[in-house]
Amino acid sequence: MSSRHPSPAPRLDPAKFRDPRVTARGEPRAAVALGGLRTLWFNTGTLCNITCRSCYIESSPTNDALVYLTAAEVAGYLDEAEAAGEPLVEIGFTGGEPFMNRDLPAMLADVLARPARYRAIVLTNAMAPLRQKARALLDLRDRFGTDRLILRVSLDHYEAAHHDLERGEGSFAKALDGLVWLAREGFTVHVAGRAAFGGEDESTLRAGFAELFARHMIPIDAADPVALMLFPEMDAGADVPEITEACWGILGKRPDSVMCASSRMVVKRKGADRPVVVACTLLPYDPQFELGATLAEASRPVPLNHPHCARFCVLGGGACSR
């Protein structure tokens, strides 16, 4: 019988991920060039209505390390991208819980109203903050339709017990209630789960989610890897190989398949005068991935100098958007 709580992985060799240019073995470290900005993420703030046991960004009701962005700040970056002719397709909002930011509806309206017809995606737990913005969401639906507004709801597992273990007792029922409401109101909904959670393989997880969606009349195809994203586990302290320049050929992967080849994220640190641009949604705190205050400054290549670069993006094939 497979274990639902596997043995801990070997811990990371402290000699790894020290130098952005070379690995612990002295081999040239892989770096990823920005091939064109197709997805721009905004971290709306790290405050969240719940505290999750394994949150990679440590969001909680008290963590305001990344403060709320304003609609004007978001508009400034969108204006910069458009003036530079960036091939933007998708604008993402993450947190924390984005619906705790009172400016989120205005941000979404700005994105959806622009002539470029961007797609907007919001990562949400679909709990109380979303329901408190229900009227604003319905107004956005009525103004802009639902084709270009995607709500991706976090459900760690298709069973309440596993989800609640991470997010608190009763959180699964509340998230599911929000997901059902969104589906009933005609919004485009996706779900984000965890690929290795519960000790099950991917086919079992997708079958479990498919049954859940069918039972609650949620129009999500559980076989679609975009509509149901199953993310690799992230443990920055677990051992993982470093990615060298030679790894692309060995693994049969291309640098342009990695998130930082086509995306950046805007954050605003507590006490800062203005936002900054970081290389990756997963690494908002690490100073080596802070690239500058503008999108132009943030266009330089990104050395893959963090365990998440290897485990999540290159080896795990993860991406926050497709």
Indicate where each model-derived feature is located.
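Accessory C-terminal segments flanking Radical SAM cores
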Residues: P232-R322
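Canonical radical SAM enzyme core domain
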Residues: T62-D79, P98-F144, L151, L155-D177, ...
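Short, flexible loop/turn motifs enriched in small residues
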Residues: C48, T146-D147, V258
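Conserved alpha-helical substructure of the radical SAM core
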Residues: P8-G95, F99-R114
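Short, P/G- and charge-enriched loop/turn segments at secondary-structure junctions
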Residues: P28-A30, L140, G249-R254
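Conserved C-terminal portion of the radical SAM core fold
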Residues: V89-I91, R119, G145-L155, G170-V240
